[in-house]
């Protein structure tokens, strides 16, 4: 990463924050989990306690509410689901242009893996982390890690 990229990354990161996250049953719209916390902070491993029934759903709708001071040309995120440090799944989401000094809500639908590939909650519990890298184009803004616990 060049000096200009580092400066751009730091400038965007300073004015970027996650305000809240909501996970819903994509079929019914029912809220399964929500948290008013800045999950974009890179210096800590975050924790999320989600209902075990989320593992039985066909698809989950994720809403991210975020604020940014800086404009972003091509806001996107890459997400890796890791089990004991090994990648199980990887997803790529692209939002595109984000205006400066705005608060935005970004909704995405995530479909479940085939049932034959699912592991039981007792095996997954505490062993799954979601690593999310936030980008503006190719410039990394922030990277966060959330450890999942099923309740």
From Swiss-Prot:
It comes from the Eukaryota. It is found in: Nucleus; Cytoplasm. Gene3D superfamilies: GMP phosphodiesterase, delta subunit. Pfam families: GMP_PDE_delta. Keywords: cGMP, Cytoplasm, Nucleus. GO terms for biological process: sensory perception of light stimulus. GO terms for cellular component: cytoplasm; nucleus. Belongs to the PDE6D/unc-119 family. Interacts with Pde6. This is Probable cGMP 3',5'-cyclic phosphodiesterase subunit delta. It comes from Culex quinquefasciatus.
